[in-house]
Amino acid sequence: MLCVNVELQERRYPILIGSGLLQDERSYPIKRGDRVMIVTNPTVAQFYLDIVIYALEKRGCVVDHVLLPDGEKYKTLESLNLIFTALLQGNHGRDTTIIALGGGVIGDVAGFAAASYQRGVRLIQIPTTLLSQVDSSVGGKTAVNHELGKNMIGAFYQPSMVIIDTLTLNTLPKREVNAGLAEVIKYGAILDYEFFEWLEQHIDELVALNPEVLQHCISRCCQIKADVVARDETEKGDRALLNLGHTFGHAIETHLGYGNWLHGEAVSTGMMMAAALSEELGDISIADVSRLEKLLARANLPTVSPDTMQPEDYLPHMMRDKKVLSGKLRLVLLKSLGQAYVANDTAHTLVLNAIRRCTQTD
Protein backbone atom coordinates (compact mmCIF):
# COMPACT_ATOMS: atom_id res chain seq x y z
CA MET A 1 0.00 0.00 0.00
CA LEU A 2 1.11 3.54 -0.79
CA CYS A 3 0.11 6.69 1.08
CA VAL A 4 0.13 10.25 -0.27
CA ASN A 5 -0.59 13.04 2.20
CA VAL A 6 -2.44 16.21 1.25
CA GLU A 7 -0.92 18.95 3.41
CA LEU A 8 -3.24 21.92 3.92
CA GLN A 9 -2.68 25.01 6.05
CA GLU A 10 -4.93 23.87 8.88
CA ARG A 11 -4.92 20.08 8.50
CA ARG A 12 -3.82 17.11 6.45
CA TYR A 13 -5.47 13.98 5.11
CA PRO A 14 -4.16 10.75 3.60
CA ILE A 15 -4.77 9.15 0.21
CA LEU A 16 -4.40 5.38 0.56
CA ILE A 17 -3.55 3.53 -2.67
CA GLY A 18 -3.47 -0.24 -2.89
CA SER A 19 -5.12 -3.48 -3.92
CA GLY A 20 -7.94 -4.95 -1.82
CA LEU A 21 -8.39 -1.96 0.49
CA LEU A 22 -12.19 -1.96 0.36
CA GLN A 23 -12.54 -5.33 2.08
CA ASP A 24 -10.00 -4.48 4.79
CA GLU A 25 -11.82 -2.99 7.78
CA ARG A 26 -8.58 -1.30 8.86
CA SER A 27 -8.81 1.00 5.84
CA TYR A 28 -11.69 2.95 7.38
CA PRO A 29 -11.05 5.65 10.04
CA ILE A 30 -14.40 5.01 11.73
CA LYS A 31 -15.05 3.76 15.26
CA ARG A 32 -17.68 1.48 16.77
CA GLY A 33 -21.12 3.07 16.96
CA ASP A 34 -20.49 5.71 14.27
CA ARG A 35 -23.24 6.43 11.75
CA VAL A 36 -22.36 6.16 8.06
CA MET A 37 -24.27 7.03 4.88
CA ILE A 38 -22.84 5.45 1.73
CA VAL A 39 -23.73 7.29 -1.48
CA THR A 40 -23.33 5.21 -4.63
CA ASN A 41 -25.14 4.17 -7.81
CA PRO A 42 -26.54 0.81 -9.00
CA THR A 43 -23.60 0.16 -11.34
CA VAL A 44 -21.03 0.42 -8.55
CA ALA A 45 -23.30 -1.07 -5.89
CA GLN A 46 -23.55 -4.43 -7.63
CA PHE A 47 -19.79 -4.91 -7.27
CA TYR A 48 -18.73 -3.08 -4.12
CA LEU A 49 -21.57 -1.94 -1.85
CA ASP A 50 -21.85 -5.19 0.12
CA ILE A 51 -18.06 -5.36 0.48
CA VAL A 52 -17.89 -1.89 2.02
CA ILE A 53 -20.94 -2.43 4.24
CA TYR A 54 -19.48 -5.72 5.54
CA ALA A 55 -16.13 -4.07 6.38
CA LEU A 56 -17.82 -1.15 8.15
CA GLU A 57 -20.18 -3.39 10.12
CA LYS A 58 -17.18 -5.44 11.26
CA ARG A 59 -15.96 -2.18 12.81
CA GLY A 60 -19.29 -1.83 14.59
CA CYS A 61 -20.67 1.01 12.46
CA VAL A 62 -24.35 1.66 11.75
CA VAL A 63 -24.54 1.82 7.96
CA ASP A 64 -27.21 3.27 5.65
CA HIS A 65 -26.94 3.79 1.92
CA VAL A 66 -28.62 5.72 -0.87
CA LEU A 67 -28.50 4.93 -4.58
CA LEU A 68 -28.37 7.76 -7.11
CA PRO A 69 -29.09 7.34 -10.82
CA ASP A 70 -25.92 6.62 -12.79
CA GLY A 71 -24.45 9.19 -15.16
CA GLU A 72 -23.33 12.79 -15.62
CA LYS A 73 -26.84 13.92 -16.52
CA TYR A 74 -27.88 13.08 -12.94
CA LYS A 75 -25.27 15.35 -11.36
CA THR A 76 -28.08 17.67 -10.32
CA LEU A 77 -29.80 19.38 -7.42
CA GLU A 78 -32.42 16.64 -7.62
CA SER A 79 -29.80 13.98 -6.87
CA LEU A 80 -28.41 16.14 -4.08
CA ASN A 81 -31.88 16.29 -2.56
CA LEU A 82 -32.13 12.47 -2.64
CA ILE A 83 -29.10 12.36 -0.33
CA PHE A 84 -30.54 14.98 2.02
CA THR A 85 -33.83 13.06 2.20
CA ALA A 86 -32.04 9.80 3.03
CA LEU A 87 -29.99 11.52 5.74
CA LEU A 88 -33.03 13.16 7.31
CA GLN A 89 -35.20 10.05 7.13
CA GLY A 90 -32.39 8.10 8.80
CA ASN A 91 -32.03 10.75 11.55
CA HIS A 92 -28.37 11.35 10.72
CA GLY A 93 -26.79 14.15 12.73
CA ARG A 94 -23.67 16.26 12.47
CA ASP A 95 -21.56 13.36 13.69
CA THR A 96 -22.38 11.17 10.68
CA THR A 97 -19.91 10.28 7.93
CA ILE A 98 -20.80 10.38 4.24
CA ILE A 99 -18.87 7.91 2.08
CA ALA A 100 -18.79 8.62 -1.66
CA LEU A 101 -18.46 5.22 -3.34
CA GLY A 102 -18.22 5.68 -7.10
CA GLY A 103 -16.80 7.81 -9.87
CA GLY A 104 -16.57 11.54 -10.33
CA VAL A 105 -20.31 12.19 -10.36
CA ILE A 106 -20.88 10.37 -7.07
CA GLY A 107 -17.84 12.04 -5.53
CA ASP A 108 -18.95 15.52 -6.55
CA VAL A 109 -22.59 15.17 -5.49
CA ALA A 110 -21.89 13.30 -2.24
CA GLY A 111 -19.10 15.75 -1.46
CA PHE A 112 -21.44 18.70 -1.92
CA ALA A 113 -23.98 16.97 0.31
CA ALA A 114 -21.32 16.54 3.01
CA ALA A 115 -20.36 20.20 2.68
CA SER A 116 -23.92 21.44 3.10
CA TYR A 117 -25.80 18.93 5.30
CA GLN A 118 -26.15 20.55 8.73
CA ARG A 119 -23.36 22.92 7.59
CA GLY A 120 -20.85 20.13 7.13
CA VAL A 121 -20.27 16.48 8.05
CA ARG A 122 -17.27 14.19 7.64
CA LEU A 123 -16.56 12.93 4.12
CA ILE A 124 -14.60 9.90 2.89
CA GLN A 125 -13.99 9.52 -0.84
CA ILE A 126 -13.76 6.01 -2.32
CA PRO A 127 -13.25 6.63 -6.05
CA THR A 128 -13.89 3.64 -8.32
CA THR A 129 -12.94 5.08 -11.73
CA LEU A 130 -9.47 5.99 -12.92
CA LEU A 131 -10.53 9.57 -13.57
CA SER A 132 -11.85 10.04 -10.05
CA GLN A 133 -8.86 8.26 -8.51
CA VAL A 134 -6.30 10.55 -10.12
CA ASP A 135 -8.29 13.77 -10.12
CA SER A 136 -11.78 14.53 -8.86
CA SER A 137 -11.63 12.72 -5.49
CA VAL A 138 -8.54 14.68 -4.43
CA GLY A 139 -8.58 18.35 -3.53
CA GLY A 140 -12.04 19.13 -2.24
CA LYS A 141 -13.95 20.37 -5.27
CA THR A 142 -17.62 19.41 -5.02
CA ALA A 143 -20.48 20.49 -7.28
CA VAL A 144 -23.59 19.78 -9.28
CA ASN A 145 -24.31 20.89 -12.82
CA HIS A 146 -26.82 23.44 -14.09
CA GLU A 147 -28.42 23.19 -17.52
CA LEU A 148 -26.47 26.33 -18.50
CA GLY A 149 -23.08 25.17 -17.27
CA LYS A 150 -21.04 22.39 -15.69
CA ASN A 151 -20.12 22.49 -11.97
CA MET A 152 -21.78 25.86 -11.47
CA ILE A 153 -23.20 25.11 -8.00
CA GLY A 154 -20.78 23.75 -5.43
CA ALA A 155 -18.22 24.25 -2.69
CA PHE A 156 -14.64 23.53 -1.72
CA TYR A 157 -14.86 20.79 0.93
CA GLN A 158 -11.98 18.48 1.75
CA PRO A 159 -12.46 14.80 2.62
CA SER A 160 -10.97 13.31 5.77
CA MET A 161 -9.51 10.46 3.69
CA VAL A 162 -9.37 9.10 0.14
CA ILE A 163 -9.28 5.30 -0.28
CA ILE A 164 -8.15 4.12 -3.73
CA ASP A 165 -8.54 0.40 -4.33
CA THR A 166 -6.99 -0.35 -7.71
CA LEU A 167 -8.99 -3.59 -7.98
CA THR A 168 -12.08 -1.49 -8.77
CA LEU A 169 -10.60 -0.71 -12.18
CA ASN A 170 -11.00 -4.36 -13.20
CA THR A 171 -14.77 -3.87 -13.44
CA LEU A 172 -14.51 -0.51 -15.23
CA PRO A 173 -15.52 -0.38 -18.92
CA LYS A 174 -12.57 0.24 -21.24
CA ARG A 175 -14.04 3.54 -22.39
CA GLU A 176 -14.01 4.77 -18.78
CA VAL A 177 -10.40 3.64 -18.31
CA ASN A 178 -9.38 5.56 -21.41
CA ALA A 179 -11.27 8.64 -20.22
CA GLY A 180 -9.31 8.56 -16.98
CA LEU A 181 -6.05 8.48 -18.90
CA ALA A 182 -6.86 11.94 -20.26
CA GLU A 183 -6.46 13.40 -16.77
CA VAL A 184 -3.30 11.32 -16.26
CA ILE A 185 -1.75 12.75 -19.43
CA LYS A 186 -2.82 16.22 -18.36
CA TYR A 187 -0.58 16.08 -15.27
CA GLY A 188 2.48 15.38 -17.37
CA ALA A 189 1.56 18.07 -19.88
CA ILE A 190 1.11 20.84 -17.32
CA LEU A 191 3.63 20.19 -14.56
CA ASP A 192 5.93 17.20 -15.00
CA TYR A 193 7.83 16.63 -18.24
CA GLU A 194 9.59 13.54 -16.84
CA PHE A 195 6.19 12.02 -16.07
CA PHE A 196 5.04 12.85 -19.61
CA GLU A 197 8.06 10.96 -20.97
CA TRP A 198 7.29 8.06 -18.61
CA LEU A 199 3.74 7.97 -19.96
CA GLU A 200 5.04 7.81 -23.53
CA GLN A 201 6.96 4.69 -22.50
CA HIS A 202 4.19 3.04 -20.44
CA ILE A 203 0.85 4.13 -21.92
CA ASP A 204 0.19 0.71 -23.48
CA GLU A 205 0.66 -0.96 -20.07
CA LEU A 206 -1.74 1.53 -18.50
CA VAL A 207 -4.37 0.83 -21.14
CA ALA A 208 -3.91 -2.88 -20.32
CA LEU A 209 -4.23 -2.13 -16.56
CA ASN A 210 -0.83 -3.50 -15.57
CA PRO A 211 -1.14 -3.44 -11.74
CA GLU A 212 2.37 -2.22 -10.84
CA VAL A 213 2.47 0.44 -13.56
CA LEU A 214 -1.04 1.54 -12.64
CA GLN A 215 -0.26 1.93 -8.95
CA HIS A 216 2.82 4.03 -9.70
CA CYS A 217 0.82 6.17 -12.11
CA ILE A 218 -2.04 6.83 -9.68
CA SER A 219 0.40 7.63 -6.88
CA ARG A 220 2.32 10.11 -9.04
CA CYS A 221 -0.87 11.85 -10.19
CA CYS A 222 -2.15 12.12 -6.63
CA GLN A 223 1.20 13.52 -5.46
CA ILE A 224 1.20 16.16 -8.20
CA LYS A 225 -2.35 17.21 -7.35
CA ALA A 226 -1.69 17.12 -3.60
CA ASP A 227 1.28 19.45 -4.05
CA VAL A 228 -0.81 21.88 -6.10
CA VAL A 229 -3.75 21.82 -3.68
CA ALA A 230 -1.39 22.40 -0.73
CA ARG A 231 -0.18 25.60 -2.41
CA ASP A 232 -3.59 26.78 -3.60
CA GLU A 233 -6.59 25.09 -1.99
CA THR A 234 -9.32 27.33 -3.46
CA GLU A 235 -7.96 27.90 -6.98
CA LYS A 236 -6.70 31.46 -6.71
CA GLY A 237 -3.33 30.66 -8.31
CA ASP A 238 -1.50 27.53 -9.48
CA ARG A 239 -4.50 25.23 -9.05
CA ALA A 240 -6.08 26.77 -12.16
CA LEU A 241 -3.36 24.97 -14.17
CA LEU A 242 -5.15 21.69 -13.44
CA ASN A 243 -7.87 22.89 -15.81
CA LEU A 244 -5.87 22.41 -19.01
CA GLY A 245 -8.41 21.53 -21.71
CA HIS A 246 -11.35 21.87 -19.35
CA THR A 247 -12.79 25.15 -20.65
CA PHE A 248 -13.00 23.72 -24.17
CA GLY A 249 -14.06 20.34 -22.78
CA HIS A 250 -16.87 21.71 -20.63
CA ALA A 251 -18.22 23.46 -23.73
CA ILE A 252 -18.38 20.08 -25.48
CA GLU A 253 -20.12 18.40 -22.53
CA THR A 254 -22.66 21.20 -22.13
CA HIS A 255 -23.42 21.54 -25.84
CA LEU A 256 -23.83 17.82 -26.49
CA GLY A 257 -25.74 17.17 -23.28
CA TYR A 258 -24.11 15.77 -20.17
CA GLY A 259 -23.00 12.18 -20.60
CA ASN A 260 -22.87 11.94 -24.40
CA TRP A 261 -19.12 12.43 -24.25
CA LEU A 262 -17.35 11.31 -21.09
CA HIS A 263 -15.57 14.07 -19.18
CA GLY A 264 -12.13 12.66 -19.99
CA GLU A 265 -12.99 12.42 -23.68
CA ALA A 266 -14.02 16.08 -23.74
CA VAL A 267 -10.88 17.08 -21.82
CA SER A 268 -8.73 15.16 -24.31
CA THR A 269 -10.06 17.15 -27.26
CA GLY A 270 -9.92 20.29 -25.11
CA MET A 271 -6.21 19.72 -24.45
CA MET A 272 -5.58 19.48 -28.17
CA MET A 273 -7.40 22.78 -28.69
CA ALA A 274 -5.36 24.39 -25.92
CA ALA A 275 -2.16 23.01 -27.46
CA ALA A 276 -3.15 24.29 -30.91
CA LEU A 277 -3.83 27.73 -29.43
CA SER A 278 -0.51 27.65 -27.57
CA GLU A 279 1.27 26.92 -30.85
CA GLU A 280 -0.63 29.76 -32.57
CA LEU A 281 0.65 32.10 -29.86
CA GLY A 282 4.23 30.99 -30.45
CA ASP A 283 4.63 29.06 -27.21
CA ILE A 284 4.67 25.29 -27.70
CA SER A 285 6.34 23.75 -30.74
CA ILE A 286 4.40 21.92 -33.43
CA ALA A 287 6.51 18.85 -32.59
CA ASP A 288 5.25 18.90 -28.99
CA VAL A 289 1.66 19.36 -30.18
CA SER A 290 2.17 16.21 -32.25
CA ARG A 291 3.61 14.32 -29.25
CA LEU A 292 0.56 15.19 -27.18
CA GLU A 293 -1.80 14.15 -29.97
CA LYS A 294 -0.01 10.80 -30.44
CA LEU A 295 -0.08 10.03 -26.71
CA LEU A 296 -3.81 10.78 -26.47
CA ALA A 297 -4.48 8.66 -29.55
CA ARG A 298 -2.54 5.73 -28.04
CA ALA A 299 -4.89 6.01 -25.05
CA ASN A 300 -7.81 5.65 -27.49
CA LEU A 301 -8.97 9.20 -26.81
CA PRO A 302 -10.53 11.70 -29.24
CA THR A 303 -8.39 14.60 -30.42
CA VAL A 304 -10.88 16.42 -32.68
CA SER A 305 -14.16 18.22 -32.08
CA PRO A 306 -17.46 16.31 -32.21
CA ASP A 307 -18.79 16.40 -35.76
CA THR A 308 -22.06 17.90 -34.50
CA MET A 309 -20.32 21.02 -33.13
CA GLN A 310 -19.20 24.04 -35.11
CA PRO A 311 -16.33 26.25 -33.90
CA GLU A 312 -18.80 29.07 -33.23
CA ASP A 313 -20.70 26.82 -30.81
CA TYR A 314 -17.87 26.88 -28.28
CA LEU A 315 -17.50 30.50 -27.21
CA PRO A 316 -20.98 31.05 -25.68
CA HIS A 317 -20.35 28.09 -23.36
CA MET A 318 -16.73 29.07 -22.68
CA MET A 319 -17.73 32.59 -21.63
CA ARG A 320 -19.77 31.06 -18.77
CA ASP A 321 -16.68 29.27 -17.45
CA LYS A 322 -15.86 29.88 -13.78
CA LYS A 323 -12.40 31.19 -14.71
CA VAL A 324 -13.87 34.10 -16.71
CA LEU A 325 -13.12 37.37 -14.90
CA SER A 326 -14.74 40.71 -15.74
CA GLY A 327 -16.10 39.22 -18.94
CA LYS A 328 -12.64 38.17 -20.15
CA LEU A 329 -11.78 34.61 -21.15
CA ARG A 330 -8.95 32.96 -19.19
CA LEU A 331 -7.44 29.77 -20.58
CA VAL A 332 -4.78 27.33 -19.41
CA LEU A 333 -2.18 27.03 -22.16
CA LEU A 334 1.24 25.41 -22.60
CA LYS A 335 4.65 27.10 -22.72
CA SER A 336 6.07 23.64 -23.38
CA LEU A 337 5.29 20.08 -22.39
CA GLY A 338 5.50 20.09 -18.60
CA GLN A 339 4.97 23.83 -18.23
CA ALA A 340 1.53 25.46 -18.28
CA TYR A 341 0.33 29.01 -17.67
CA VAL A 342 -2.92 30.98 -17.52
CA ALA A 343 -3.53 33.29 -20.48
CA ASN A 344 -5.77 36.28 -19.87
CA ASP A 345 -8.15 37.73 -22.46
CA THR A 346 -6.91 35.75 -25.47
CA ALA A 347 -8.38 37.10 -28.72
CA HIS A 348 -11.50 35.18 -29.69
CA THR A 349 -10.33 34.99 -33.30
CA LEU A 350 -7.26 33.01 -32.19
CA VAL A 351 -9.41 30.74 -30.02
CA LEU A 352 -11.69 30.02 -32.98
CA ASN A 353 -8.69 29.32 -35.22
CA ALA A 354 -7.41 26.76 -32.71
CA ILE A 355 -10.82 25.10 -32.53
CA ARG A 356 -10.98 24.93 -36.33
CA ARG A 357 -7.62 23.16 -36.38
CA CYS A 358 -9.20 20.46 -34.21
CA THR A 359 -12.38 20.09 -36.27
CA GLN A 360 -13.16 16.87 -38.09
CA THR A 361 -12.73 16.96 -41.85
CA ASP A 362 -13.90 14.41 -44.39
Curated annotation (Swiss-Prot):
SUPFAM superfamilies, per the entry: Dehydroquinate synthase-like
Cofactor note: Binds 1 divalent metal cation per subunit. Can use either Co(2+) or Zn(2+).
EC top class named in words: lyase
Record keywords: Amino-acid biosynthesis, Aromatic amino acid biosynthesis, Cobalt, Cytoplasm, Lyase, Metal-binding, NAD, Nucleotide-binding, Zinc
Family: Belongs to the sugar phosphate cyclases superfamily. Dehydroquinate synthase family.
Reactions the enzyme catalyzes: 7-phospho-2-dehydro-3-deoxy-D-arabino-heptonate = 3-dehydroquinate + phosphate
Function, as annotated: Catalyzes the conversion of 3-deoxy-D-arabino-heptulosonate 7-phosphate (DAHP) to dehydroquinate (DHQ).
UniProt cofactor(s): Co(2+); Zn(2+); NAD(+)
Pathway it works in: Metabolic intermediate biosynthesis; chorismate biosynthesis; chorismate from D-erythrose 4-phosphate and phosphoenolpyruvate: step 2/7
Cellular location(s): Cytoplasm
Lineage: Bacteria, Pseudomonadati, Pseudomonadota, Gammaproteobacteria, Pasteurellales
The name this protein goes by in its record: 3-dehydroquinate synthase
Gene Ontology biological process terms from the UniProt entry: amino acid biosynthetic process; aromatic amino acid family biosynthetic process; chorismate biosynthetic process
